[in-house]
Amino acid sequence: MNVLRFCAAPLAALALMVCTSAFAHDPSEKVTILQDEMLKNVPGKKALMIKVDYEPGQSSIAHKHEGTAMAYVLSGQIISQVKGEAAKTYKAGEFWYEPAGSEHMVSKNASATQPAKLLVFMVLAPDEKVLIPLEH
């Protein structure tokens, strides 16, 4: 019975979030893991390659990565801003680097009418988180 009392409030909040999101447009991007491999020449580290698909107007939440990230715009245009730097628009074929722990304040599709795709390559330890939401 104590377990039920302990879980009731969090479960009710979760149910409310799920019901609310069913009526709202999903603002988050689609992330696809393309490759996830341990690096034999760098003990204790792995390489992760992901594709990020943004629908028109979509954006990521403010976040940071525990690992080093390198991003390449496959199609469309992406607006990216790391804390302490100005926002920059990257076009297809352009790329940038984010040191481990950088706070990524803005990552979004620059277009309200066209989709955009981003290829991200990361190097991190197997127990490090790919994305940590920022509380701002």
Residue ranges and their predicted role:
Residues P27-A62:
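A short glycine-rich, His/Asp/Glu-containing loop-to-beta-strand
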Residues M1-L11:
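Bacterial N-terminal signal peptides that target proteins for export
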Residues G67-E85, E94:
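Glycine- and acidic-residue-biased ligand/ion/polar-headgroup-sensing regions
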Residues T20-D26:
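Sec/Tat signal peptide C-region and signal peptidase I cleavage site
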Residues S59-I61, I79, W96-N109:
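Histidine-centered metal-chelating micro-motifs
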Residues A9-C19:
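Bacterial N-terminal signal peptides
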Residues L39, P43-G44, Y54-E55, G84-G101:
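Short acidic-glycine-tyrosine-enriched beta hairpin
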Residues A86-A87, S102-E128:
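Ligand-binding loop in jelly-roll beta-barrel domains
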